């Protein structure tokens, strides 16, 4: 029926300030942002209903029969790379883990490293750019700290130094795909 569904666009602050008890919010994103939304004074005071999907742990799994040179192997490399670089990996549906049979680890590492090395990082308004910045300096530091920690615990696949295009490093928060 008319009015059963409304889509209102604007900044989150403006939207949450204008919610009423009859409204419901569906949010997909980080648990931290969901907590901020849930605790917004207007959301609490008006008992706004919320549906939250937060911090997904999406996985890519490579089967032992998907060997280098196969279509499945190529698709796995393409999709893992795409998930790492689209929106700089900052989307709730991004792959967070890739499970690879030990026998295929060297092949996957080499193929993924080669693909990531070709990733152009910079201002996403430039058509040649395939990976933009992370959201802010705090996130950039968190990601870099996590990378540094992981380097002490695991084998890292590095995309090399990012090839920055139309990027202002004083304003943008760029990280090489890792």
Q: What is each model feature region?
A:
Residues 1-11:
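PLP-dependent aminotransferase-like
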Residues 4, 21-27, 31-177:
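ALDH superfamily catalytic-core signature
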Residues 14-15:
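Short acidic active-site motifs
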